[in-house]
Amino acid sequence: MGFLDKLFNKTDINIAVEQFRATPGAFLIDVRTGPEYEAGHIEGAINVPLNSIHFIVNHVRDITAPVYVYCQSGARSGQAVSMIREMGYKNVTNVGGVNRFKGKLVR
């Protein structure tokens, strides 16, 4: 994890995906646009675009559930995490950008 990741409170996306997969009841949220999501996303991720982030309540009803949020580079996920926390969610993590994910993407 680099200095900027620490500065912007981001967790390494590869570690976070492992944590997501190992945690029952956790959610992985992709806040990119629909076309970006369809072009390639992490298996198990739910697409809730940043401009529709308020719809997260349709997917994550438990405000204490672990929620991992990513985008393309980490900027939109940072914005989304702030917005989700403002909605009352307690356990939300910015995991940065899918551009740093080393695993295979679902297309």
PLM features: what roles do these ranges have?
Residues 2-19, 23-26, 34-66, 75-107:
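Rhodanese-like catalytic fold shared by cysteine-dependent sulfurtransferases
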Residues 30:
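N-terminal glycine-rich beta->alpha transition that marks the start or flank
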Residues 70:
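Short, surface-exposed ligand- or partner-binding patches at beta-edge/loop junctions that are enriched
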